[in-house]
Amino acid sequence: FIAELFPELNKAVYIDSDTVINDDIAKLYSVDMGDAMFGAVRDTFAGKNTILAHYIENVVGIERDEYVNSGVLLMNLDKIRQAHLADRFLKLMAEYHFDSVAPDQDYINAMCAKEIYFLDKEWNVMPNKGGEYIARPKLIHYNLFDKPWHYSEIPYEEYFWQYAAESGFYPLLIKQRKQYGDNEKKADRENLKKLLARAENIADGDGVKFSDVVGSRIVVDSGFVKDSSDAAK
């Protein structure tokens, strides 16, 4: 609802709180994303995980390598308002009550799949173990459970601790990591298992999925907003 909250703005950057910015954020704001509604980075963790990839393709209804992470968004607010995206979102949510594992992220991917500009991966680097290492990350997103204030040896943790040391919260953060014990870590592992199990159950279940609702995608043609179902007629 950022577009409605700030009607005087035509563009905005949204960033999750579990992030570290290593470059001038104005560079992200200045990216030319053409006529796209959103600029975002592909979610490599979700796309490479077998269960989540199955979920993306069967529930969200898009290809796994087109699914983006909504933790960092460049937003074309004029286009979002033009498409009445907030109203469409509320209508879909009220009518279908989609079951999903990442509600806001899934809605953006399902509704706006053809309106997303893929940003350079350096603008949303996630510390997933086994993933591609980015030598010069512009923005690090400590997504899911890989938080350096909870765990040691997290990829890109040095950037977080560099800035933490310059803040007044460094001693508290060190204490918090030391106190994050076996019970908390076990809970994280169990929660990840539950998330994956839920994704699998939704994908293989009989409930209404985003992919079942053809008209949920937005097509903007010469300033006139239509559902993709209309565009196909």
In which residue ranges do the predicted regions lie?
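GT-A fold catalytic core of metal-dependent nucleotide-sugar glycosyltransferases
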Residues: 1-48, 74-75
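A short linear-motif detector with a strong N-terminal bias
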Residues: 16-20, 50-54, 96-98, 117-122
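Surface-exposed acidic, glycine/proline-enriched linker/cap segments
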Residues: 47-61
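A generic fold-level signal
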Residues: 7, 14, 33, 65-67, ...
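A short acidic (Asp/Glu
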Residues: 25, 51, 129-130
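A glycosyltransferase accessory/donor-loop signature
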Residues: 69-70, 75-233
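Short, surface-exposed, charged loop/turn segments at secondary-structure junctions
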Residues: 29, 54-55, 87-92
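A generic local secondary-structure boundary/capping motif
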Residues: 2, 60-64
